[in-house]
Amino acid sequence: MGRPAARDLTERELEVMHVFWSRGEATAAEARDRLAESGLDRTYTTIANLVRALTEKGFLRQLNDERPFVYRAVRSYEDVSGRLLGDLVQRVFRGSRAQLLCRLVGQHRLSAEERTILEQILEEPPR
């Protein structure tokens, strides 16, 4: 069986994944606390159920057999975000990265920092 598609993540599962990407390893309680610190107050049971679902889907791995269970992300942020973005380009923009860029840049004025980053990317030799 192949890896689950990144688009199979719900919004709440993605919130939980961000905790594991930033912390490395965590328990469900630690994930709940980190989310609460960032303004996403969820019950422990909700987070524990999301962690269980992420483990079953293959996004997290349980590291120990005794409580409290410690988990770590199996799929990296780069992998998941890249696949989600690729899926967005295919589904919404029919494969056109140019349309995506036009929409992104056309929506709001770029900050000086964003403009600098974009210029650096454009100066890189093509792959």
Locations of the language-model features?
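Short capping segments at the starts of secondary-structure elements
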Residues: L9, V19-T27
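Glycine-centered, phosphate/nucleic-acid-interacting loop/turn motifs that mediate DNA/RNA or nucleotide
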Residues: G58
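Short, cationic-aromatic polyanion-contact patches
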Residues: T10, D65-R83
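Amphipathic alpha-helical dimerization/coiled-coil segments
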Residues: V80-R127
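Short beta-strand "wing" residues that participate in macromolecule-binding interfaces
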Residues: Q62
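Pre-recognition alpha-helix immediately N-terminal to the DNA-recognition helix
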Residues: L14-H18
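Short acidic, hydrophobic short linear motifs in intrinsically disordered regions
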Residues: A26-L35
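Short, hydrophobic-biased segments on the C-terminal half of alpha helices
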Residues: A48-R52
